[in-house]
Amino acid sequence: MKRMSEGMKETSQSNILLESGTNELEIVMYKVGGETFGINVLKVREIIQPLPVTKTPQHHQYVEGVFRLRQEVIPVVNLAKVLGYPPSPEPNQDKFIIGELNKVKVAFQVQSVSRIHRISWEQIEKPSELSQGSHIQTIGVIKLEDEIALLLDYERILMEISLK
């Protein structure tokens, strides 16, 4: 009986290893300014409808303000502003992607969230300097069957906001 449970433990551990060793990741796809972007699902806590935001004095231009979610005060970063796109045509239809990056909780305001894609690391290309342009926040180009999506450096975006 003891050996059987040990064997079962080994099997379940190897399944976990097999699953984590698949060279795949899941990406939440969203749109800002008509363009498609992605964020690793491991950085996402939840996706919610926008809640009322309280403006804060002397905040960074990319920060819309803060809101309270289950007793936590969370800042809202407007990704359209970060990326230089015009404001959302229908802000009531926007979504908040609640993320946790380096133990900092933040809401990224996006215009829509479409789905989660499971992709392999081989589908992500490093952007060329030419295609990256002034958006140094872009760290990857995700090649999907019918479109491409940009992978942003969310930690860098937060770092830029906190430095200014």
Language-model segments: residues:
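An acidic, low-aromatic, low-complexity terminal/linker signal
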Residues: 1-164
